[in-house]
């Protein structure tokens, strides 16, 4: 499809399909902003959060958000939580510093993969995975290796549509402080846009890229969006090319 379509028209057409969505990792920075944008855009008829604890919201806009509390160590016991969703967004993730090497791999690979398997079995058609710039299953760095491994494993599940997002350093104000991240964000925030955009990206831009992508017609089963593509798609306002 060569011609561009108005983004507003794509969103409206998508809303008319009354699709349901689940979010994994809604308590994290990206998941939190993603939920906010989903509700503001009104793209889905049903929104479900799947997590290890119930989240508390004061705003009226969140009153119809469904929540499924699961034990990620026993996900097979919670298969019903993953049933009946058209679209899924996975923003699960921790760090080696917080969870240790084994704990990091457990969350970022094992939990993500098992969740994807249950989502596929439950009827999910479009699975969106938040990964990382430089993800490579052959990498010597554990973080990038695990990210690359889970990307490949989820692809093997053969979702009707599978979108992988590889942002650079996420520019945000975390509710949870991680040592060194403030300094990194400050560094990238002071660089010229042309250089910083190749290595960093605001969380809200990542989220908007995810949602702009979900409403546009797919042109292939597996989509891999690197940092520059995330910037371009996340800043689109008027039109999109599929």
UniProtKB/Swiss-Prot annotation:
GO MF annotations, alphabetized: NAD binding; oxidoreductase activity, acting on the aldehyde or oxo group of donors, NAD or NADP as acceptor
SUPFAM superfamilies, A to Z: NAD(P)-binding Rossmann-fold domains
The protein's name: Protein HTATIP2
Subcellular location: Cytoplasm
Active site as annotated: 143, 147
Function: Represses translation by preventing reactivation of elongation factor eEF1A. May also inhibit nuclear import by competing with nuclear import substrates for binding to a subset of nuclear transport receptors. Has additionally been proposed to act as a redox sensor involved in cellular oxidative stress surveillance.
Region feature Required for interaction with elongation factor EEF1A1, mapped onto this chain: 2-25
Organism the protein comes from: Pan paniscus
Keywords: Acetylation, Cytoplasm, Disulfide bond, NADP, Translation regulation, Tumor suppressor
Pfam families in UniProt: NAD_binding_10
N-acetylalanine PTM sites in chain numbering: 2
GO biological process: alpha-amino acid biosynthetic process; angiogenesis; apoptotic process; cell differentiation; import into nucleus
GO cellular component, as recorded: cytoplasm; nuclear envelope
Gene expressing this chain: HTATIP2
Biological classification of the source: Eukaryota, Metazoa, Chordata, Craniata, Vertebrata
């Amino acid at each position: 499809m060569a011609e561009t379509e108005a983004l507003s028209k794509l969103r409206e057409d998508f809303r008319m399909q009354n699709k349901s969505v689940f979010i994994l990792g809604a308590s994290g920075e990206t998941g939190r902003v993603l939920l906010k944008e989903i509700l503001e855009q009104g793209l889905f008829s049903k929104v479900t959060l799947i997590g290890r604890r119930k989240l508390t919201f004061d705003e009226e806009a969140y009153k119809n958000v469904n929540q499924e509390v699961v034990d990620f160590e026993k996900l097979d016991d919670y298969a019903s939580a993953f049933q009946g969703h058209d679209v899924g967004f996975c923003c699960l993730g921790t760090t080696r510093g917080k969870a240790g090497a084994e704990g990091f791999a457990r969350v970022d690979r094992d939990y993500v993969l098992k969740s994807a398997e249950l989502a596929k079995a439950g009827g999910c058609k479009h699975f969106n995975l938040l990964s990382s710039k430089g993800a490579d299953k052959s990498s010597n760095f554990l973080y990038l290796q695990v990210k690359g491994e889970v990307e490949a494993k989820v692809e093997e599940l053969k979702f009707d549509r599978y979108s992988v997002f590889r942002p650079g350093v996420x520019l945000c104000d975390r509710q949870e402080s991680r040592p060194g991240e403030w300094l990194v964000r400050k560094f990238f925030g002071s660089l010229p846009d042309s250089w910083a955009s190749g290595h960093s990206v605001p969380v809200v831009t990542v989220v908007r890229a995810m949602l702009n992508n979900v409403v546009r017609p797919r042109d292939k089963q597996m989509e891999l969006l690197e940092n520059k593509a995330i910037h371009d798609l996340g800043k689109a306002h008027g039109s999109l090319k599929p």
